[in-house]
Regions:
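Alpha-helix-loop-beta-strand connector modules within alpha/beta enzyme cores
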Residues: 60-79, 124-146, 188-215, 254-270
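Glycine/Thr-rich beta-alpha phosphate-binding loop at enzyme active sites
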Residues: 53-60, 114-124, 157-208, 212, ...
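Hydrophobic faces of well-ordered beta-strands that scaffold small-molecule active sites
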Residues: 15-21, 40-45, 80-84, 107-109, ...
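N-terminal capping/small domains of soluble enzymes
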Residues: 1-80, 84-90
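Conserved alpha/beta-domain cores
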Residues: 84-140, 158, 164-175, 191-195
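Glycine-rich phosphate-binding active-site loops on the catalytic face of alpha/beta enzymes
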Residues: 44-50, 106-115, 171-181, 219, ...
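Catalytic cores of alpha/beta
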Residues: 28-34, 90-101, 152-167, 208-213, ...
């Protein structure tokens, strides 16, 4: 929808609503159903070189499976975001390169999963993370996204944000872990209390200086949820639970609800509300 169209990491998307990597995004049939049912970007499930049978959340058929689907969908003007895991730096770099050459527009390094955290340990030090990001950046032409763990280890949030900016990372994928009792006046964007980071997504948006965009993942089940995520800094939202419960139609429903709320509040574009939350205190 025109009102929900955005530019994420320099890539034009027809909606700010997308699937979260994982649900309904691993098998050919479900990927094609998502592609047909929703106009926004399509996010692949995280993959490695040879595929995995476990853990269940990373079960996948391997990078060539996803690269083949990308090569089919990209000529049909589908914007694809591919997600990468691996248990070595070399594997992560290799997978990113294969997906990039298949034509995906954004390559996400899923550095948040325990599988990567416990093997590659990218957040063990600033130097380690910077070296990995630099290697991947040198391998791909697509925009680079980093999925951040809830607690990025030894690296402070401000230092991490500065590194994302310095290394040319286009997108930070963050948890939309807003307080359950958060009170937001949708019409004005006012939030009770003093200025404070409300979620990981909000915290990294505040540190971004507009250099990278933020995708908020989690807790988005309605158009209102998406609206609040946008108010607190998210350029786009990733939908998981609603997709599992409702199937592919959940994305279109949330997109339509968001579009309706934007219209009700006199907004011509979702871009008008990104980061516009204000504190009363």
């Amino acid at each position: 929808m025109e009102r929900t169209a955005i530019r994420l990491g320099g890539v034009e998307l027809s909606s700010s609503v997308m699937n979260a990597s994982g649900p309904h995004s691993a098998e050919r049939g479900e990927i094609y159903e998502l592609s047909a049912r929703h106009q926004g970007a399509l996010v692949f499930k995280s993959c490695n070189v040879a595929g995995l049978e476990a853990p269940e959340n990373l079960k996948n058929r391997g990078v060539e499976h996803f690269a083949a689907i990308a090569r089919e969908l990209v000529p049909r003007h589908k914007v694809i975001i591919a997600s990468v895991v691996g248990n070595t730096e070399d594997e992560i770099v290799k997978v990113a390169g294969i997906l990039d050459r298949a034509g995906v527009k954004i390559v996400e390094l899923n550095l948040a999963d325990d599988y990567v955290m416990n093997s590659v340990a990218p957040f063990a030090s600033y130097e380690r993370l910077k070296a990995l990001v630099g290697r991947v950046h040198g391998e791909i032409g697509a925009a680079l996204a980093i999925k951040l763990p809830p607690k990025p280890g030894a690296i402070e949030a401000k230092t991490l944000a500065n590194m994302l900016k310095e290394m040319g990372v286009s997108v930070a994928v963050c948890a939309n872990d807003l307080p359950k009792d958060l009170e937001v006046d949708i019409a004005t964007g006012l939030i009770k209390g003093g200025a404070r980071p409300l979620s990981q997504a909000h915290a990294f948006w505040r540190l971004s200086d507009g250099v990278y965009d933020v995708v908020a993942v989690g807790g988005v089940n309605t158009g209102r949820d998406a609206y609040v995520a946008h108010l607190t800094g998210a350029k786009a939202v990733g939908v998981g639970s609603a997709l599992i419960k409702e199937g592919a139609g959940a994305l279109g429903r949330i997109d339509r609800e968001l579009d309706g709320m934007l219209a009700e509040n006199g907004k011509r574009s979702v871009n008008e509300i990104v980061g516009q939350a204000r504190f009363e205190g």
